[in-house]
UniProtKB/Swiss-Prot annotation:
Originating organism: Acinetobacter baylyi (strain ATCC 33305 / BD413 / ADP1)
Main location group: membrane
Protein's UniProt keywords contain Cell membrane: yes
GO BP of this protein: proteolysis
Enzyme class: hydrolase
Name listed for the protein in its UniProt record: Lipoprotein signal peptidase
Length: 179
């Protein structure tokens, strides 16, 4: 079996980062599996109560998050597909270049990547994204979403935590090491 080795340069690759690609793949698998269950067991736009604040409601989202641009006439399909593809490629390169001791940032990138690819699969194969999780409180309804959207949201929160709280610590440690 060939041994995986780190490569230098633009395409440098660290084998320890395969675990983060595994997290992305896990997010995609769970997302696609739950969307398949929703699509095969739910009737379109017919809410199934789960908890007093949660319904399973199968919906088709032709736009972006929260149905943004869903009624824009079709061009948004190409825009969102292209953006998701480009961002995914960038995130794969970024993810594979993470240092061994990094945890929060690669987890964030892996979740965002998995969520983006999960929704991209829908958009490319179905022409829309399957949403089915519907949260509400009394008459206040949050737009339906899916596991991919949840992975993107959790990844974004982790990215913000890393950026605003952990980056300063990394800079301080680097300055101490340098002195």
């Amino acid at each position: 079996m060939p041994k995986l080795e780190a490569k230098k340069g633009l395409f440098q690759f660290y084998p320890h980062n395969l675990i983060w690609l595994g997290l992305s793949i896990l997010a995609i698998i769970i997302d696609q599996w739950t969307k398949w269950i929703a699509s095969t067991h739910l009737n379109y736009a017919d809410p199934v109560p789960v908890l007093p604040f949660l319904n399973w409601t199968l919906l088709h989202n032709y736009g972006a998050a929260f149905s943004f641009l869903s009624d824009a006439g079709g061009w948004q399909h190409y825009l969102f597909t292209g953006l998701a593809g480009i961002v995914s490629i960038i995130f794969i390169f970024w993810l594979m270049r993470m240092p061994k001791n990094a945890m929060i940032l690669p987890a964030a990138i892996a979740l965002i990547l998995g969520g983006a690819l999960g929704n991209l699969i829908d958009r490319m194969t179905l022409g829309y994204v399957v949403d089915f999780i519907h949260i509400y409180y009394q008459n206040h309804h949050f737009p339906a979403f899916n596991i991919a959207d949840s992975a993107i949201t959790i990844g974004t929160i982790l990215l913000l935590i890393d950026t605003f709280f952990l980056e300063k610590q990394r800079i301080q440690r680097a300055e101490v090491k340098h002195d």
